[in-house]
Amino acid sequence: MSLVEPTEPVEVDKLGRVHFIGMGGAGMSGIARVLLQRGVEVSGSDARDSALLRELEELGATVHVGHAAEHVGDADTVVVSSAIRDTNPELVEARARNLRILPRAAALGALLLGRCGVAVAGTHGKTTTTSMITVVLQHLGAMPGYVIGGQLVTTGLGADAGADDIIVVEADESDGSFLMLSPRVAVITNVEADHLDNYGDLEEIHDKFAAFIGRVSETVVVGVDDPGARRVAEVARQRGLKVLTYGEADTADYRVRDITVDGFTTMFTIDPPTGDPVHCTLPLPGRHNTLNAAAAVAVADTIGYDPEVAVEGLAEFAGAARRFEFKGEANGVSVYDSYAHHPTEIAADLDAARAALDSQAAKGGKAGRIVVLFQPHLYSRTRIFAEEFAAALTKADEVVVLGIYAAREDPEPGVTAELITERIGHDRVYYRPDRDAAVECVVSVAQPGDIVLTMGAGDVTELGPRIVEALG
């Protein structure tokens, strides 16, 4: 993957008939869904059939499995996934016919035009924060549109056109494509080194976030505990934007304090800039999720809603798919799935799991352990962050590591998941590149009271249900 050349979005009513190449992914299917709901004629293709494709077909899309030039049909606009190669026959056909070709983010940007757009950006926490904002606004009586990188657990949907002026979207910095969005409000959760296959270094990432801030028209909501996000806040102030901060720091406009944990429920207080403190009960573990929640309250307040009512919506938040998602329980072992694929994300989820187990033990429960099944994502990320991955995974009691999920990359000589396993600071580590062997290993070490976490951005997510079944 490489950085995407920014393309200015086109108003939805000027797109004409739209064809999606690579329509089966979460991001592309979400945009297609919203366009269908807004009355746009949509067709699309993907290499493999999927439930998402069938859902779009039921909404009225013309769906093709496999790629062929004739699938483009009489489209006026073609939207292309970043996973599509230049040699794709549909893309070749679209270019030969001089059709309007948009990257995914430009199509997403079209959905924001003329609406109160809220875009959530940052290295970590985007999907959960976008989901929280959506659920909070729904609780407050709004009917926002939304396009999220994961599905809401309560509805099973990751996108909807909505019925009022607000739309909440997840802004992807990985390839620079968030520079095609022009939101009224932006959230910056944090800024760290990641996607270094695209960016030369952290400074280049900061430059891209600074450019993104230049596309925001009104307000920037920033996680003030993070040094990288604080730098972005300074850029926003210099450009005359309204800046609101959230975090545990005393200087935060929406200050999080008095965090307590009861199993997988987290209680805390938020001090807003005006008015009384608001008390929140969040049915999710993790200090990082209290910060995501504070961002959601700040956005709701910015739009004009009462923070005290907003936190009631957080109490109803059931989470987003693959974000510490409960997959099942068998023989006293609880299995969860996590999209964490960066060392910071892994450490945050393992800290959350440990806090939940400790709170249960403090009430006289069994002192359970953490068993992780981790799948490294990308050869480049494994090579760059091997030490950091090992340090984060040391927080688990038992660590089973799969082979690297290559995704878009070709193998690199000498780069395997063993770069991580050989650096983990205890001996309860098992390298199992074979999926069946990995599941068997997890089941053999798990004990009643333990938490099993499948972690990674690849197909490790498929193994959670298998582990539950095998444990039973």
Swiss-Prot record:
Pfam families assigned: Mur_ligase, Mur_ligase_C, Mur_ligase_M
Subcellular localization: Cytoplasm
Domain of life (superkingdom): Bacteria
UniProt GO BP: cell division; cell wall organization; peptidoglycan biosynthetic process; regulation of cell shape
Pathway where it operates: Cell wall biogenesis; peptidoglycan biosynthesis
Enzyme kind, highest EC tier: ligase
GO molecular function, one term: UDP-N-acetylmuramate-L-alanine ligase activity
One GO CC term on file: cytoplasm
Catalytic activity, reaction form: UDP-N-acetyl-alpha-D-muramate + L-alanine + ATP = UDP-N-acetyl-alpha-D-muramoyl-L-alanine + ADP + phosphate + H(+)
Record key words, sorted: ATP-binding, Cell cycle, Cell division, Cell shape, Cell wall biogenesis/degradation, Cytoplasm, Ligase, Nucleotide-binding, Peptidoglycan synthesis
Residues holding ATP: G122, T123, H124, G125, K126, T127, T128
Main location: cytoplasm
EC number: 6.3.2.8
Entry-linked NCBIfam families: murC (TIGR01082)
Function description: Cell wall formation.
Family that this chain belongs to: Belongs to the MurCDEF family.
Protein name: UDP-N-acetylmuramate--L-alanine ligase
